[in-house]
Regions:
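Short, conserved beta-strand segments within well-ordered enzyme catalytic domains
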Residues: 41, 50, 68, 86
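Short, conserved beta-strand element in jelly-roll/cupin
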Residues: 34-49
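Short histidine-centered beta-strand/loop micro-motifs
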Residues: 26-34, 50-51, 58-60, 77-79
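A short, N-terminal "cap"/entry segment at the start of jelly-roll beta-barrel domains
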Residues: 1-32
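Ligand-binding loop in jelly-roll beta-barrel domains
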Residues: 71-91
Length: 91
């Protein structure tokens, strides 16, 4: 699994989302802005992280296994059941 580059600075964290409160936009393909990295942090349950592209990747995120979002890379999440998670942003 990917890791964040060491020279990034955390600047924002979303509120905690659940399977009931996750914004619909996160369930559809979207990207971060140029230079913005994301770190999907699952606090409870599990979440499927799908990276789109010529060779799509799918990862099951659980507590202790974050998903790293590369700038401008199309991706989305899919619900697997009960979950609590947030997204940290770095640049």
């Amino acid at each position: 699994m990917r890791t964040l580059p060491a020279d990034l600075t955390h600047y924002k964290t979303t509120p905690e989302f659940t399977q009931e409160s996750v914004p619909r936009g996160l369930l559809r393909n979207h990207t971060t802005a140029a230079g913005v990295w994301g770190r999907i942090v699952v606090r409870e349950g599990s979440l499927r992280y799908v990276i789109e592209g010529p060779e799509p990747e799918t990862h099951l995120l659980v507590p202790g296994t974050p998903g790293i979002v590369v700038p401008e890379e199309p991706h989305h999440v899919a619900l697997e059941g009960p979950v609590r998670f947030c997204v940290e942003f770095h640049r």
